Design a protein with these regions (language model features):
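Glycine/charged-rich beta-loop-alpha catalytic/anionic-binding loops adjacent to active sites
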Residues: 58, 93-96, 116-117
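Short, structured loop/turn "capping" segments at alpha-beta junctions
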Residues: 88, 118-122, 145-148
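Glycine-/charge-enriched secondary-structure boundary and capping motifs
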Residues: 17-35, 43-50, 127-206
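Short, surface-exposed connector motifs at secondary-structure boundaries
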Residues: 3, 114-121, 167-170
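Polyanion-binding loop/helix "lid" in catalytic or ligand-binding cores
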Residues: 98-135
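Short, compositionally biased
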Residues: 85-103
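Glycine-rich anion-binding loops of enzyme active sites
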Residues: 2-88, 201
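Secondary-structure boundary elements
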Residues: 27-32, 69-70, 112-119, 184
Length: 206
C-alpha cells in the first residue's frame, strides 16, 4: 500500500530526551515523506519508548497478507544489505539513516509494485522476531510449514550469523511466490538496493 500519515504514542521517563525524540520524529517524516498528524504523550512513563501506527491506502484485492502462503510456494528473503548496526542496539540493522530519502521511499513503492501485479502471494516485513521468527509468524497464520536453507539467506558479510538471524532491518521482507516469478522479484528489487534470494519452500508440515 501507499503510506499517507502516521500517529504516535510517546512515553518518556527521562525529560532530557524530549528534544531528541521530536527531532528524530521530524527527520523520519522527512525521510519517508509521510507526515505525523497526531499522537499521545505519556510524560511519566516507566521507560522511554516510541510507537508508531501508519495509515495508508491499498487496493483491497492486492494486499500482501501473512496468511496466503500455499504448499509449493518458494520462500524469498529480501533485505537491504547496505546498512550498519544501530549504535544503541546491535540487532537493529539500520538501512535508512544514511540513505537518500528518495531511495528509502522507492523501496516501499517497489514492494507495492510487486503486490499490485500479483508477483507476491504472501509476505511480512521482517520485525522484532528476526528473519526466521518473522517467517514462522507467516507460516503459523498460513497453517503451513517450510524447509529453509540458511546459507541462502542474504547476509551482510560483516555480521555474525547469530546476530543476523535475530536482527530486524530497516528494509527487509519475507515473501512467498510462485517459482516462475522469483527471478523477476530478485532482479527488480536489486535496482532498489534490496538483495533477494530464494531460501526455501513452503510445505504442509505445520
Amino acid at each position: 500500500g501507499k503510506p499517507l500519515a502516521m500517529v504516535n504514542i510517546m512515553s518518556v521517563k527521562h525529560d532530557e530526551i524530549y528534544e531528541n525524540l521530536l527531532a528524530g520524529i521530524k527527520d523520519g517524516c522527512l525521510k519517508f515523506g509521510v507526515p505525523m498528524v497526531g499522537g499521545h504523550l505519556h510524560p511519566d512513563g516507566e521507560v522511554d519508548s516510541l510507537g508508531v501506527a501508519i495509515v495508508g491506502i491499498a487496493k483491497k484485492d492486492k494486499l500482501i497478507t501473512s496468511f496466503g502462503a500455499e504448499v509449493g510456494d518458494k520462500i524469498i528473503v529480501a533485505i537491504d544489505l547496505d546498512g550498519k548496526p544501530h549504535e544503541m542496539f546491535e540487532l537493529n540493522w539500520d538501512t535508512t539513516y544514511d540513505k537518500d530519502k528518495q531511495l528509502v521511499q522507492d523501496q516501499i513503492t517497489a514492494v507495492q509494485y510487486l503486490a499490485e501485479r500479483d508477483y507476491i502471494k504472501s509476505g511480512k516485513d521482517i520485525s522484532n522476531p528476526g528473519i526466521l521468527g518473522t517467517l514462522e509468524m507467516l507460516l503459523e497464520t498460513s497453517d503451513k510449514g517450510a524447509i529453509v536453507n540458511l546459507e541462502d539467506i542474504p547476509k551482510n558479510e560483516n555480521i555474525s550469523w547469530e546476530n543476523w538471524l535475530k536482527s530486524y532491518p530497516g528494509s527487509g521482507f519475507i515473501f512467498t511466490a510462485n517459482e516462475e516469478n522469483c527471478e523477476f522479484i530478485k532482479e527488480y528489487l536489486k535496482d532498489y538496493s534490496i538483495e533477494a534470494n530464494v531460501v526455501g519452500e513452503v510445505n504442509g508440515e505445520c
